[in-house]
């Protein structure tokens, strides 16, 4: 090969390498979300605010539950999705650690664990706490003086008529229903649980509100907007069984390195999402039937994050 041919070959290699880099940088950021109401809301908010800041995305909202989402991001099938700090206890088998009951400490712990093991980066969290809860129909709670899970456990011990609507994840995970049962000394029989497809509390709350199949209680989240409006009361958790579940965007390090401004773009939005704000936004979807993307867009426009 003479010098001219060598030079031509080198130029071709350089051109191909440049094309490859450009193709990678032009590839859209794959944004996923969980299947529940708040997952859809947060997923759409992330997509809208990133697009508004010139970051190309592929919207993969409503993929599945925590297990599905974790599998997708660790396998590189998605780049980013909103997760909850308290799920670190389940993901990394640290359910017994008290660190998850503290918002800041729990965030720092999961941030370290996920980066060290999976090179997944936890960005700034929201101040909200979307923890798991059990909500009971108001007339049942009033008639039996049920205000806390301690009250509920004692009432169930006397043979109280109770049937819970919940997701499979809530029923199966050791840090969910099982943790409540252990802490408050009750055990539901299979016929006392109606397991519903997906993980959407809009469905479980509706089942309790409509007394579907005899249901009079529901799995709920701390930021659900439909609980009180549909005549349910959340049982207080005086023993603090559940971790703090602060929503936060998590992203593969490789994807973040390609566009570092993602962290800066998402931080102001998540800072605005306190508990009452998320309850109000979730209610628009759960109660008013508004589309999650519309609710997300309207909120971002009202805060000046979207034109």
PLM regions with names:
Residues 79-80, 215-217:
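Short, Asp-centered acidic motifs that coordinate Mg2+ and/or phosphate
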Residues 18-20:
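N-terminal signal peptide c-region/cleavage motif recognized by signal peptidases
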Residues 25-38, 55-61, 160-165:
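Short, well-ordered beta-strand elements
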Residues 85-178, 182-186, 190, 195-199, ...:
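Contiguous mixed-secondary-structure segments that line small-molecule binding/active-site clefts
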Residues 37, 59-71, 168, 189-206:
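Short helix-initiation/N-cap motifs at beta->coil->alpha
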Residues 61-78, 85-90, 97:
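Acidic helix-start/capping segments at beta-turn-to-alpha-helix junctions
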Residues 37-56, 178, 182-184:
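Short, polar/charged alpha-helical segment
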Residues 6-10:
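N-terminal export leaders
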